[in-house]
Amino acid sequence: MDNNTLFAQSISLKELGIENATVRYQLSADELHAITVQSGQGVEASTGALAINTGEFTGRSPQDRFIVKDSITEDKVWWGNVNIPFAPEAFEKLYNKVKAFLSNKEVFVRDSYVCSDPNYRLNVRVVTETAWSNLFCYNMFLRPEDSELANFTPEWTVVCAPSFMADPAVDGTRQSNFAILDFTKKIALIGGTGYTGEMKKGIFSALNFILPVFENTLPMHCSANVGKDGDTAIFFGLSGTGKTTLSADPERKLIGDDEHGWTAENTVFNFEGGCYAKVINLTEENEPDIFRAIKKGALLENVVFKAGTNEVDFDDVSITQNTRVSYPITHIDNIQPGSIGHNPKNIFFLTADSFGILPPISKLTPGQAAYHFISGYTAKVAGTEAGVTEPQPNFSACFGAPFMPLHPTKYAEMLSKKMKDADVKVWLINTGWTGGAYGTGSRMKLKYTRAMITAALNGELDNVEYVNHKVFGIAKPQSCPNVPSEILNPRNTWEDKDLYDKKALELAQKFKANFAKFEEFANAEILAGAPITE
């Protein structure tokens, strides 16, 4: 059904101040695909997916993300390098310029919503300069029924104009690109960047303020799935730690792969209606769900084709390492109807520790869970340039600091209370290195990580012996089905045990240094979850 024909007459952007625009409203995925190809802005890949290039920006630009400092946000947002304040007057002037820029142009408008739980539904209208940006929002946000559109009232608006360039000297931005949230006007304003993830993370950031402040609901940067008995599992983790991979389990139904809410009514729900997956080095063997989802309707970003073909070379990172695909969650077979589950029974914190110190699986106390949640640790492998092989620690509070407007301890307190009330087991999973740090040891085998998670989910680790790690104090199981017991204690996998002890203390000191800025806000239980540093 061509909704454009049905509803174009009733959609006006005058309320937004965009005048005389040619509005292409609620186009189907096929129509947006065709327009993008016809305009020369994209190419159809051999699988039927649409491939586009996002331009100069192939990732988010955290230094150019702002929140308008107003009566709603002034006393609640944790202002600083993550949440950078923007003056209401400056926003008004910049928004007026964007409105004038989009007036008298063809624009693509989509009505959608976020939050799959009907009690928390938030209607979002998206106004984009390009058809492919609109396709991204069709894929990623939830899609209302045609019957809902006649009476659709947007609560938030996303305005995305990639070819509008700000003037930093006049507009108060850092450079020509920007992503700004205004909680009074309820607008996410994006310009100067074609990276589609700015739209997704803009609304995620808005929900990360709205839900805890007004709805007593914990927003989470996590994936989630449900077992045959209705038991929900949640996987927190930064990019590259295995959220998408480990939540894709043939024995369990996927709720979602990235953004969820945990309500006071004991439900866990997906914010989104799609998946936004990395495709670097993608193979059907390692990631069958993602690989098979790259078909008609999917949107590939910044990939390269094999010479002379329209077949994607997933190993080619000549444009960026952050090659991506978005697709509706319905492209995956094994999904949870309605994208809602009940209270989780197990929570997994995923870290790719390339120092090789943390155990592959350990059980956390409530205090340790809060400490590690606030820390949000993983480690990046340094680039090979100039012979640098030493891993770099990466701490991102709540496993998603760039998207969290409130102080991290606010989210941690909510999580701690919910974990205690629901009697949740919390596990720290190291998907990183074993037998030494990066360069000496090896990456933990995926089959072992999967076996450990399966054992935890099935209750097979409830009655085994545990020994506390001497530095981090976390409880290491001494046995696990289908996993060699020698890898469960990381110290035993190192040839040089003294070096392991030294490096473990060094990592603990990195944790302590990072946590210093949170100490004054943390209670005694959380502080007791810290590692020993001497």
UniProtKB/Swiss-Prot annotation:
| Pfam families tied to this protein | PEPCK_ATP
Q: What GO annotations for molecular function exist for this entry?
A: ATP binding; metal ion binding; phosphoenolpyruvate carboxykinase (ATP) activity
- Enzyme class at the top of the EC tree: lyase
Cofactor(s) this protein requires: Mn(2+)
Q: Which sites bind substrate?
A: R60, Y195, K201, R324
Q: What is its EC number?
A: 4.1.1.49
Has the keyword Chaperone been applied to this entry? no
- GO BP term, example: gluconeogenesis
- Which amino acids does the record list as binding ATP? K201, H221, G237, L238, S239, G240, T241, G242, K243, T244, T245, E287, R324, T449
Q: Which locations, inside or outside the cell, does it occupy? A: Cytoplasm
- Which pathway does the record list? Carbohydrate biosynthesis; gluconeogenesis
Q: Which reaction does it catalyse?
A: oxaloacetate + ATP = phosphoenolpyruvate + ADP + CO2
Q: How is its cofactor bound, per UniProt?
A: Binds 1 Mn(2+) ion per subunit.
Keyword line: ATP-binding, Cytoplasm, Decarboxylase, Gluconeogenesis, Lyase, Manganese, Metal-binding, Nucleotide-binding
Q: Which residues bind Mn(2+)?
A: K201, H221, D258
* SUPFAM superfamilies from the UniProt entry: PEP carboxykinase N-terminal domain (SSF68923), PEP carboxykinase-like (SSF53795)
Record's GO cellular component, any one?
Answer: cytosol
What is known about what this protein does?
Answer: Involved in the gluconeogenesis. Catalyzes the conversion of oxaloacetate (OAA) to phosphoenolpyruvate (PEP) through direct phosphoryl transfer between the nucleoside triphosphate and OAA.
To which protein family does this belong?
A: Belongs to the phosphoenolpyruvate carboxykinase (ATP) family.
**In its UniProt entry, what is this protein called?**
Phosphoenolpyruvate carboxykinase (ATP)
Source organism (scientific name): Flavobacterium johnsoniae (strain ATCC 17061 / DSM 2064 / JCM 8514 / BCRC 14874 / CCUG 350202 / NBRC 14942 / NCIMB 11054 / UW101)
Q: What is the lineage of its organism?
A: Bacteria, Pseudomonadati, Bacteroidota, Flavobacteriia, Flavobacteriales
